[in-house]
UniProtKB/Swiss-Prot annotation:
Plasticins have huge conformational plasticity. They can display random coil, alpha-helical, beta-sheet or beta-harpin structures. Keywords: Amidation, Amphibian defense peptide, Cleavage on pair of basic residues, Cytolysis, Hemolysis, Membrane, Secreted, Signal, Target cell membrane, Target membrane. Expressed by the skin glands. It comes from Agalychnis callidryas (Red-eyed tree frog). Residues 23-45, 70-71 form a propeptide. GO terms for biological process: defense response; killing of cells of another organism. One of its GO terms (cellular component) is other organism cell membrane. The keyword Amino-acid biosynthesis does not apply. Residues 30-40 have a biased composition (Acidic residues). This is Plasticin-C1. Pfam families: FSAP_sig_propep. Residues 1-22 form the signal peptide. It comes from the Eukaryota. Residues 25-46 are annotated as: Disordered.
Amino acid sequence: MAFLKKSLLLVLFLGLVSLSICEEEKRENEDEEKQEDDDQSENKRGLLSGILNTAGGLLGNLIGSLSNGES
């Protein structure tokens, strides 16, 4: 009977260890996915900011040239 108890405890312990390892890997994968999403969001914001700055500069030049032409 003692042999069965020890075997059962060993099986439970190994199961808990493997479950813990799986949970840790899952957390790492989720962190990596979140980091990738954050990087993509930053890239999109940077791209949008660049487009808006360029459009603003072009619009400013156009208005400036129109106001100079009217004088």
